[in-house]
């Protein structure tokens, strides 16, 4: 009985790391590389901090297949990322554009660093 249980446990362990594999057929290796590059730049809207290649959420699979089909249609990276941004918002981009809304996010670290340097300089000047 213990031998059978151990065999069953080992069998399940082999399949514990199984993942979903995309079987999308590309016309050439360049298209495949382009599609994978674009999908790695886009964030899954459902899973925090995972790109479309890493996530197996249904929305990520759908978005990944959309990227693949758009690459197969001959669309370039700018068109595909633009379409995804239009549909899902700037959140899907790992590098959001510099706009009025994101300016605070880009400028805040620099402002805080300068503020800390000023405070440190004043404290040292008093001594």
Curated annotation (Swiss-Prot):
Classification via InterPro entries: C-type_cytochrome_biogenesis, CcmH/CycL/Ccl2/NrfF_N, CcmH/CycL/NrfF/Ccl2_sf, For-dep_Cytc_NO2Rdtase_NrfF
Organism: Escherichia coli (strain K12)
CDD domains: CcmH_N
Taxonomic superkingdom: Bacteria
Entry keyword set: Heme, Iron, Metal-binding, Periplasm, Signal
GO molecular function: metal ion binding
GO cellular component assignments: periplasmic space; plasma membrane
Functional description taken from the UniProt entry: Not required for the biosynthesis of any of the c-type cytochromes. Possible subunit of a heme lyase.
Localization annotation: Periplasm
The family this protein is said to belong to: Belongs to the CcmH/CycL/Ccl2/NrfF family.
Description of the deletion phenotype: Triple nrfE-nrfF-nrfG deletion mutants no longer attach heme 1 (covalently attached to 'Cys-122', the CWSCK motif) of cytochrome c552 (AC P0ABK9).
Record's signal peptide: 1-27
Binding residues annotated for heme, in chain numbering: 44, 47
NCBIfam families on file: cyt_nit_nrfF
Pfam families given in the database record: CcmH (PF03918)
Descriptive protein name: Formate-dependent nitrite reductase complex subunit NrfF
């Amino acid at each position: 009985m213990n031998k059978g249980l151990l065999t069953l446990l080992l069998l399940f362990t082999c399949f514990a790391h199984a993942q979903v594999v995309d079987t999308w057929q590309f016309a050439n290796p360049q298209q495949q590389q382009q599609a994978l590059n674009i999908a790695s730049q886009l964030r899954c809207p459902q899973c925090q901090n995972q790109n479309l290649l890493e996530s197996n959420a249904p929305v990520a699979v759908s978005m990944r297949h959309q990227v693949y089909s758009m690459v197969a249609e001959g669309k370039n990276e700018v068109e595909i990322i633009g379409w995804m941004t239009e549909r899902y918002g700037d959140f899907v981009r790992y590098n959001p554009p510099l706009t009025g809304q994101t300016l605070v996010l880009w400028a805040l670290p620099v402002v805080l660093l300068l503020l800390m340097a000023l405070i440190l300089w004043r404290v040292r000047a008093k001594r």
